[in-house]
Amino acid sequence: MHCESPIKRRLSRKIWVGSVPVGGDAPIAVQSMTNTDTNDVAATVAQIRRLEDAGADIVRVSVPDMDAAEAFGRIKQQVRVPLVADIHFDYQIALRVAELGVDCLRINPGNIGREDRVKAVVEAARDKGIPIRIGVNAGSLEKDLQKKYGEPTPAALVESALRHVEHLDRLNFPDFKVSVKASDVFMAVEAYRLLAKQIEQPLHLGITEAGGLRSGTVKSAVGLGMLLAEGIGDTIRISLAADPVEEIKVGFDILKSLRLRSRGINFIACPSCSRQNFDVVKTMNELESRVEDLLVPLDVAVIGCVVNGPGEAKEAHIGLTGGSPNNLVYIDGKPASKLTNENLVDELEKLIRDKAAEKAAADAAVIVRS
């Protein structure tokens, strides 16, 4: 039951991606990207719906050619979450998906082409009320910047971004967000720090090509955590070579750890030792999988013994501390009941679900009164 985050967020301009606000005082949005063949409409729709169920605020879809653009239009009609079309090389694809109802256009300045092509995309976006993401990536910098800097650097990433920010400014188009991604944590972090000082637009954070589920999670948590703790960032994407649903889970876990956004159960659990009165690892693994469908924010402490157990349990909505002969349960900081190891997970799940329902009803009542 912790207080609000002490982080003071950078004040940015608010834009709208479909129905989702990004920037300003809006919650930090969590994004993912499909990894299906966009031309396989059924598979892509199915994956997007799984991402919706996992809590994705925005989903990006790669649109590599005109056939994929037509497929994108059919996909858009079958999902609820706002969709971003990821466009490279052919600006005409961006023009087509704008006609088909895209919620945001992501273009890469390094490969979209001449300024007149960027202007055409901007005018299409303006006509349809569609925001743009300028997506700069260390792996696809413009050739003149590669020659100037010799290799990708934070300064090169920022220079690439700023030249296209200035272009959109000249076209009087303010509704855009910017990313300056790299697979190197230090390069990405420094680029975002530099850029945050120079523009007012919202920033989309990510460590690109971060890696597999474990290594990518660690790299993203370190890089994005550094920036978010400094108040930088308005929307995030965790790039993992894994099921995209895992990106949403990790994204929300990062935000929860910084108290920037609460969604679902925040578990506090000990690593366990010989003092444990129940199998903490087994209990946690089973409990996490059972209640991952819950969206109500709750703190749940699962501590194996009485050394730190009572202290942690008292600070949670629901706390379990191991003890002999029985384990003690705290509800809202007060001792409530005792549980044996038999059916422990079943009993905890019921307590968590009951508490979640109670909190959801209380929150709804507050909204009605206000």
From Swiss-Prot:
The keyword Iron applies. It catalyses: (2E)-4-hydroxy-3-methylbut-2-enyl diphosphate + oxidized [flavodoxin] + H2O + 2 H(+) = 2-C-methyl-D-erythritol 2,4-cyclic diphosphate + reduced [flavodoxin]. It is an enzyme of class 1 (oxidoreductase). This is 4-hydroxy-3-methylbut-2-en-1-yl diphosphate synthase (flavodoxin). The keyword Transcription does not apply. GO terms for biological process: isopentenyl diphosphate biosynthetic process, methylerythritol 4-phosphate pathway; terpenoid biosynthetic process. Binds 1 [4Fe-4S] cluster. It comes from Ectopseudomonas mendocina (strain ymp). SUPFAM superfamilies: FMN-linked oxidoreductases, Nitrite and sulphite reductase 4Fe-4S domain-like. Its cofactor is [4Fe-4S] cluster. [4Fe-4S] cluster binds at C270, C273, C305, E312. Pathway: Isoprenoid biosynthesis; isopentenyl diphosphate biosynthesis via DXP pathway; isopentenyl diphosphate from 1-deoxy-D-xylulose 5-phosphate: step 5/6. Converts 2C-methyl-D-erythritol 2,4-cyclodiphosphate (ME-2,4cPP) into 1-hydroxy-2-methyl-2-(E)-butenyl 4-diphosphate. Belongs to the IspG family. Keywords: 4Fe-4S, Iron, Iron-sulfur, Isoprene biosynthesis, Metal-binding, Oxidoreductase. GO terms for molecular function: 4 iron, 4 sulfur cluster binding; 4-hydroxy-3-methylbut-2-en-1-yl diphosphate synthase activity (ferredoxin); 4-hydroxy-3-methylbut-2-enyl-diphosphate synthase activity (flavodoxin); iron ion binding. Its EC number is 1.17.7.3. Pfam families: GcpE.
